[in-house]
C-alpha cells in the first residue's frame, strides 16, 4: 500500500508554491562529507526545457547548466547511490530515488527535496520499485511496473492511480507545456491485447484510488488483434483516458510527446522505424526509416518548435528527422499511392500471381511496417559512420538545403570565383570528412541506385515494396565519440540559431588545397545536446538548411572535477 510521510506538512504548500526560485548558478553551492570515490553514473537526464542536466551517481548527484553555457551549478555528496533524479525546470525542487544498495535506502522511496534550503519536503513510499518519475508544473507522475500514480505537485495529494500491464522498462511520456491551459497529457503503453470500445476501461485502466472515478467512452483507433505497440493517451487535467493510438505491432521501445502535447513520436523494439502521430486525431503524420538492422532506441525527443525529432540508439548514432513540408508531402504521396487502385488488365496466369502479390499487402495493412519495410543502415559496429550520410538525404530537395545566410557569407570569404559545380556542392548535405570510409561510399552509391530504381519502377510495384527502395530518411545525423561499448545516450535539440566558429577543414574534401587550412568559418547552427552513460556532455551543430553530418562543437566531462 502507498504510504506518505510528510517532513514539513505545515509549510508544504508554501514551499512548493515558491519553487520558481532558481538554484544557485555560481558553481559554489555544494555539500561535502564522507563519500564513495566511485563516481559511476547511475542516471542522467535533461530537465523539461533542456537548460539543465541532472546526474545521479554512486556518491550523490550533480546539477549542470547547459544554456547559455555549460557549467556545474550544484552538487551533493553523500553515502547513498542515486538511481533516479528529476528536476522541475531550473528550480530548487528535485525528485530523488535511491538505488537501495545502502542500509536504510530503498528504491521504493521517493524524496522531494529543496536544494536551496537543503531540506526534504516529503517522502513517499510505494509498494514496488520506482521505475520512472516525471514532473510538470502541476503534476508529479510516479511509474511502477504495473501502476502509475498521479499527484498534485502543489499539495502532494494523490489524485489518481492507473493500473497498467507490466511495463518493466518504465516507458511513459508527458507534455511539459509551461502554460497551465495547454495540453497536459500522459502517454504510456497499452495492454498487449485487442482493445475495443467497450472493454478499454476494464482491461487497461483502473480508476480506483483517485478523486475521479472515470466511466466514460474512449475514442479508440486500435482495431487489430495481438498488438503490443499501442499507446494510451491520458488527460492529466480531467484525469480521464482520451484515446488509444495504434503505433506499432511490436513492443514499444521509446515514446515522447512534444512539449505542447500536440505530437507523439514512437519507436518499436526493432528500432528501424520512427513514427509521428497527431495526438488530437491519432493520425500518423510522418514515418521515417532509421536503419536496416534492428537496434535499441534509447530516446526520442521533439525540438521545442516541433520541427524536428531526435533519436538516439545503441548504434551510438543520433538521427535528426525533420518534420517539414517536403517530408509531409512525401508521406502523403506514399499514402495516396498505396490507396490508388491499379488499372485492370486481361487476366493471365502470371498476372494472377501479381494480383495475389498486390492483395497481400492490403490484407496485411494492420501489420507493422517494422517487419516488412524497415530499411536503413545502422550497422555502426560493422561499418564505421554507416547510416548518417547516405544519399537518401537527397530526398529533401537541394533547393531546400540552401546554405543559411550566415553560412553563405562564410563560404564567400574563401570561395569567391568558384565554378557552378562547387557552388552547387554548397547546397548538398554537410559531410564530415573524418567519417568517410570506403564502405560508407559504397553504401551511398548503392542507395542512390536503389532510389533511382524506385523512381522508375515505383508505378509498377506494390506501394510497400517501392517504399522499401525509396524511404523517407533522416535529415541529419551525428556519431557520438564514445570511449567504450554499449554506451547509452539521450539527446535534445535547441531550436535557437547560434553563430559558431567551425574549422574550414570540416567542410572541405581531404584532397582540397584548403583542407589543411586552420581558418575558422562562422556558421549559423542549431545546437544538439547529447549526454551519455559514460558521463560526457556533447554539443553538436546542425545546419538547418543543409542537414547532413552535425559538427562537434564542445565536449565536457560530467564526472571530472577539473571540468
Swiss-Prot record:
Residues 329-430 are annotated as: Disordered. Residues 366-393 have a biased composition (Acidic residues). Belongs to the WD repeat PROPPIN family. GO terms for molecular function: phosphatidylinositol-3,5-bisphosphate binding; phosphatidylinositol-3-phosphate binding; phosphatidylinositol-4-phosphate binding; ubiquitin binding. Residues 404-417 have a biased composition (Low complexity). A motif (L/FRRG motif) lies at residues 288-292. Keywords: Autophagy, Endosome, Membrane, Protein transport, Repeat, Transport, Vacuole, WD repeat. The N-terminus might form a beta-propeller domain involved in specific binding to phosphatidylinositol 3,5-bisphosphate (PIP2), leading to the association of the protein to the membrane. The L/FRRG motif is essential for the cytoplasm to vacuole transport (Cvt) pathway, for the recruitment of ATG8 and ATG16 to the PAS in nutrient-rich medium, and for its recruitment to and dissociation from the PAS under starvation conditions. The keyword Glycosyltransferase does not apply. This is Autophagy-related protein 18. It is a peripheral membrane protein. Pfam families: PROPPIN. Component of the PI(3,5)P2 regulatory complex. InterPro entries: PROPPIN, WD40/YVTN_repeat-like_dom_sf, WD40_repeat_dom_sf, WD40_rpt. The PI(3,5)P2 regulatory complex regulates both the synthesis and turnover of phosphatidylinositol 3,5-bisphosphate (PtdIns(3,5)P2). Necessary for proper vacuole morphology. Plays an important role in osmotically-induced vacuole fragmentation. Required for cytoplasm to vacuole transport (Cvt) vesicle formation, pexophagy and starvation-induced autophagy. Involved in correct ATG9 trafficking to the pre-autophagosomal structure. Might also be involved in premeiotic DNA replication. SUPFAM superfamilies: WD40 repeat-like (SSF50978).
